[in-house]
Amino acid sequence: MAVCEAILNICSAPIWDLPKIALSANWMSSFDNEFDKYNLYKTAESITSNICNKLGVTIPVGKDSLSMKMSWSENDKEISVKSPNTLIISAFSSVYNLKNIVKPMFVNDHNTSIVFIDLSGGNYRTGGSALSQVLKTKDTECPKVDNINNFKNFFKATQHLIKNNMILSYHDRSDGGLITTLLECSFAGHVGIDIDFKKDILDINKYMFNEELGVVVQVSNKLLKDVCKIYSDNNIENHVIAKINNTYEINILAEKDTVFTSSLEDLHKTWHKTSYEIQKIRDNAESAENEFNIIGNKKTKGLYIDK
């Protein structure tokens, strides 16, 4: 998952070929017992054999932190805390043209559609997700890469679309799931959207908040059929998930029946609240408050160049 998520992060840039991507791996472990040593070895083996070799990408650089354990004495007791085995992947590549990079922000164009590309094989696994942590559920099944060939086909198809300027915006699904991905693009673009989910989804919360592999792309309606066909021809699941609206609101519908409505400004402030509280303590409190007050305001231009 770490490797594929890193690749999805830079897939919006004109890279053309997967082997052009190189990875940096940061390995972290306490590495003080046979169990952790075995798990670390199996992780490295799986990354190389099951993922990198099949994708044709390399890991030329990286670092390791293999002493992730703290021990101390307290009330005549020996106490220790250690990090679980953790791998952080960063991806990098040269690109053909910076102007072809597709941004993670929706364009305010009503003649467009937002398409969800699902790379999970229809799974809603929520183990380790923000949803499971907030609700304190004991979901043991975590997202994983089910079909590496499908992932390769997705990369190739998406690079073709970028090369031919057929995608207006792009954002990968990650922390917070599909709903957060859609909201972040709306916040960045300052546009409201109508999100339409199917009524036959068995668990709407898991569908919205699972953190499986996937992306959303915004496409001109003139090219919508062509874009969807390219993905479908590569056996990649895709469907229209949202449309731009002119109300500056986020509306969630279940096949046209509205189940949730909120102003974009209110949701943007909620999304930014944690960062704001930290910023108040860390930086100038008055400046932090001034910034927070204009978050999501439709009339705020933000940083711009007056030509």
Predicted regions and their residues:
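Short, solvent-exposed beta-strand edge segments and adjacent coil->beta transition regions
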Residues: E212-G214
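Intein/HINT protein-splicing elements and their conserved insertion hotspots or analogous self-processing inserts
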Residues: I15, Y41-T43, T58, D64-F209, ...
